[in-house]
Amino acid sequence: MTIRSPEPEVKKVKVVVDRDTVKTSFEKWAKPGHFSRTLAKGPDTTTWIWNLHADAHDFDSHTNNLEDISRKIFSAHFGQLAIIFIWLSGMYYHGARFSNYEAWLADPTHIKPSAQIVWPIVGQEILNGDVGGGFRGIQITSGFFQIWRASGITSELQLYCTAIGALIFAALMLFAGWFHYHKAAPKLAWFQEVESMLNHHLAGLLGLGSLSWAGHQIHVSLPINQLLDAGVDPKEIPLPHEFIFNRDLLAQLYPSFAKGVTPFLTLNWSEYSDFLTFRGGLNPVTGGLWLTDTAHHHLAIAVLFLIAGHMYKTNWRIGHNLKDLLEAHKGPFTGEGHKGLYEILTTSWHAQLAVNLAMLGSLTIVVAHHMYSMPPYPYLATDYGTQLSLFTHHMWIGGFIIVGAAAHAAIFMVRDYDPTTQYNNLLDRVLRHRDAIVSHLNWVCIFLGFHSFGLYIHNDTMSALGRPQDMFSDTAIQLQPIFAQWIQNTHASAPGSTAPGATASTSLTWGGGDLVTVGSKVALLPIPLGTADFLVHHIHAFTIHVTVLILLKGVLFARSSRLIPDKANLGFRFPCDGPGRGGTCQVSAWDHVFLGLFWMYNAISVVIFHFSWKMQSDVWGNISDQGVVTHITGGNFAQSSITINGWLRDFLWAQASQVIQSYGSSLSAYGLLFLGAHFVWAFSLMFLFSGRGYWQELIESIVWAHNKLKVAPAIQPRALSIVQGRAVGVAHYLLGGIVTTWAFFLARIIAIG
């Protein structure tokens, strides 16, 4: 008798929905706090409005039904997309209605981008600066003009049409959000169908998304940009649909188009190398990446993701099963390995979100570093204001997203983690040796902090004593970043050895002596690294490690600690462990996110200061007819940034002159923002450095005075809770700091760049 193991059941993936789940009604809109029994009663004290805002989107607190929570999140995503489409539509509409896009397109080296004109009310029209070509408006640094040119947009009419299209898509998204919550709401099983979701997201979003963009680039962007680069008047260039429907037009520019798909079907793919290139480096006309390289890149990415989108098992017997994959991962030292993680990621959206935010935040920072080193759009590299803005923007956003990852990881630990189902797997093992992790990380932070700061203090002291020969610098005691220089050199010498088809390295910043200039401005050149970079790099290492220490400690000790063993019962955010237990304040997971934000701010500030000064000193500048490059700050980074005094004197103070002296000019708004944002930042300290009782006492006196005059309010005033005060404090601290930096950077770079 043969015993057969039962055939593994092939699950059937179906789209399952519930019809007419929630009645559509506007009545709830008139009942603030309808989602909570306590809030729905209405306000007794002013705390009500704070709790209303804190809990409005905390779907976990509205219900513990995972299916309903999933549907709310899904529906909210469509609302988010609608907002994005409305915002994009506004950007394109401004380009169509209020901008000098067509003038910029005709002469991008002499005309600056502007898409906002201030109305003449009480003299505000002073903000309309002369951006060239007789146009007066606010100079913008968002990079939209450059991306429009790369897309092949040649007229303001096309921008109008796109703006209208975006509004139509916004309406569609709003409809979809309503439809999939009220009319046809997916069942929980659909949200947990990970293999199908992976296939569709990989093949659909990333695969077909990249393929359609590659198609647009090949059929529309490439020919239009080729003609623009050759100096053809934008009004003479055929419209996009003419290129799409008339192959002969394309064949004039790219001869392989005349052959159609024959080379593709006969595997002679190299025939297409006239529009799918592998050149490396930058286009000397525009200072951007070769658009034929980027089209090739998107086509390759599309192929990879289309394959990736067919790797996971759904209704057929072929492909990976994610649960099996995770549970098969057992190393010799990792116990049960990934066992149990599948259940976590399919039942806790906080855990899922934490992983995704950590990835997305890191990717955003990677984008920041590639935008300047491999500028993807025409004339982006020589628009210094835009380069600085894009780098700063992506660094800030990446920092915030990474802190968000820690926040949601901690919420997962508090609300969704079930210790009974997680035994000896990786998560359990990390939690069991959390003391070793945190204490070692703490040691690393102390080491990095003392040593990195100590190098600067040494230099300041030697400088003050008049002993330059004893300083750490490129001209005295050298601390060269030899590993970074080795990586630069490896990449600079790659073309011809490891990448035989490439004519230049991936980025000019690696080295090799080439420099690209556009209209007598430097687009990019090899970036030298020396002692100054070595020093500031270790400050980066220090601030990043401290941020990680705070955030990771918050996650690892979110449920319990030696100080508060029952922390999980107190929730994600709480001020202290009740009265009578001193020294237990500021230990909640929320407080760790709060503290982590300040160190994230420290970390990103040092990065953007480093970038701003380094680029002005060693990269950005003008080139004379004789080929001599003059940098904006004349290469002073290497000698000035090696002391704290140098950073204060030659960077912050020297470069603040433009924003401080901006009054009476078209940059005066930045001067006012600089002043106002300092005030907002200082205002935050009032919330961060004072206790709740102080304000409650003050409020009691004020209420007494109102009672005397018989004008006492029906809703009782209350001081902010400890957590609310800290939230308001950190929000103003970050807003004030970021706007101060924004005004400082832009006034400087627009005035001189």
UniProtKB/Swiss-Prot annotation:
Cofactor: record remark: P700 is a chlorophyll a/chlorophyll a' dimer, A0 is one or more chlorophyll a, A1 is one or both phylloquinones and FX is a shared 4Fe-4S iron-sulfur center.
Binding locations of chlorophyll a: M686, Y694
What is this entry's stated membrane topology?
Multi-pass membrane protein
Q: What class of enzyme is it?
A: oxidoreductase
Entry EC number(s): 1.97.1.12
Which residue windows are transmembrane per the record?
Answer: 73-96, 159-182, 198-222, 294-312, 349-372, 388-414, 436-458, 534-552, 592-613, 667-689, 727-747
Read off the Gene3D superfamilies from this record: Photosystem I PsaA/PsaB
Where on this chain does phylloquinone bind?
W695
* Pfam families hit by this protein: PsaA_PsaB
Q: Name one GO molecular function term.
A: chlorophyll binding
User: Which residues does chlorophyll a' bind?
Assistant: H678
- Residues annotated as binding [4Fe-4S] cluster are C576, C585
SUPFAM superfamilies xrefs: Photosystem I subunits PsaA/PsaB (SSF81558)
Per the record, the GO terms for biological process are:
photosynthesis
Q: Where in the cell is it found?
A: Plastid, Chloroplast thylakoid membrane
GO CC, sorted alphabetically, is: chloroplast thylakoid membrane; photosystem I
What does it do? PsaA and PsaB bind P700, the primary electron donor of photosystem I (PSI), as well as the electron acceptors A0, A1 and FX. PSI is a plastocyanin-ferredoxin oxidoreductase, converting photonic excitation into a charge separation, which transfers an electron from the donor P700 chlorophyll pair to the spectroscopically characterized acceptors A0, A1, FX, FA and FB in turn. Oxidized P700 is reduced on the lumenal side of the thylakoid membrane by plastocyanin.
Cross-referenced NCBIfam families, in alphabetical order? psaA
For this entry, the protein name equals Photosystem I P700 chlorophyll a apoprotein A1
Query: Which species does the entry assign this protein to?
Result: Pinus thunbergii (Japanese black pine)
Q: Which gene carries the instructions for this protein?
A: psaA
